[in-house]
Curated annotation (Swiss-Prot):
One of its GO terms (cellular component) is Holliday junction helicase complex. The RuvA-RuvB-RuvC complex processes Holliday junction (HJ) DNA during genetic recombination and DNA repair, while the RuvA-RuvB complex plays an important role in the rescue of blocked DNA replication forks via replication fork reversal (RFR). RuvA specifically binds to HJ cruciform DNA, conferring on it an open structure. The RuvB hexamer acts as an ATP-dependent pump, pulling dsDNA into and through the RuvAB complex. HJ branch migration allows RuvC to scan DNA until it finds its consensus sequence, where it cleaves and resolves the cruciform DNA. Residues 139-143 are annotated as: Flexible linker. The keyword Ribosomal protein does not apply. This is Holliday junction branch migration complex subunit RuvA. One of its GO terms (biological process) is DNA repair. It is found in: Cytoplasm. Signal peptide: none annotated. Has three domains with a flexible linker between the domains II and III and assumes an 'L' shape. Domain III is highly mobile and contacts RuvB. Homotetramer. Forms an RuvA(8)-RuvB(12)-Holliday junction (HJ) complex. HJ DNA is sandwiched between 2 RuvA tetramers; dsDNA enters through RuvA and exits via RuvB. An RuvB hexamer assembles on each DNA strand where it exits the tetramer. Each RuvB hexamer is contacted by two RuvA subunits (via domain III) on 2 adjacent RuvB subunits; this complex drives branch migration. In the full resolvosome a probable DNA-RuvA(4)-RuvB(12)-RuvC(2) complex forms which resolves the HJ. Residues 65-139 are annotated as: Domain II. It holds the Pfam family RuvA_C. Belongs to the RuvA family.
Length: 193
């Protein structure tokens, strides 16, 4: 299994790359989220990879972050989702946006992606629930509500609450609330549960 490639980026043609690694050129497909963050051709690049071996081909898919690769792997486990569709999902939305859609069970958001119909979107939501750090999406939503959501969440976890409980409580904290006041409001919300 090829898990990582480091080399010189020779070609960039969305979504395909050619990376020279000690004289061997690897063709790698990447999601657009990775493509837009690549260095210029001729520069060094490090990609985390997922190798897929088929009867007729050995394919490499590359990612800049471990979260993207993990999400790609989770998508591949879903019936009816192949590598191309998984790549399309990651090209159409970030890992955080996907996690948030899963947390909110927002099928409409997924159906906007090319090749994803209503049934496929519902299957994605069902099978990804709790598997790709859905709390990441919830935290992103909570962060938009409160400037100090991460600090408040860390304090709640330090007090013995789970991240899931903390994220639910943070939703009750208005935007712009300070950390200490936010902790008080979150604790008040948790005491009502």
């Amino acid at each position: 299994m090829i898990g990582r490639i480091a080399g010189i980026l020779l070609e960039k043609n969305p979504p395909h790359l050619l990376v020279d690694c000690n004289g061997v050129g690897y063709e790698i497909d990447v999601p657009m989220s990775t493509f837009y963050n690549l260095p210029q051709t001729g520069e060094r690049v490090v990609l985390l990879t997922q190798q897929i071996v088929r009867e007729d081909a050995h394919l490499l898919y590359g990612f800049l972050t471990p979260q993207e690769r993990t999400t790609f792997r989770e998508l591949l486990k879903i019936t009816g989702i192949g590598a191309r569709m998984a790549l399309a999902v990651l090209s159409g939305m970030s890992v955080q946006e996907l996690a948030q859609a899963v947390t909110m069970q927002d099928a409409a958001r997924l159906t906007r992606l090319p090749g994803i119909g209503k049934k496929t979107a519902e299957r994605l939501l069902l099978e990804l629930k709790g598997k790709l750090g859905a709390d990441l999406g919830a935290l992103a939503g909570a962060a938009s509500q409160s400037d100090h959501a991460t600090d408040i969440l860390n304090a709640l976890v330090a007090l013995g609450y789970s991240e899931k409980e903390g994220l639910a409580a943070i939703k009750n904290v208005p935007a712009g609330t300070g950390v200490s006041e936010g902790i008080k409001l979150a604790l008040k919300a948790l005491s009502k549960v």
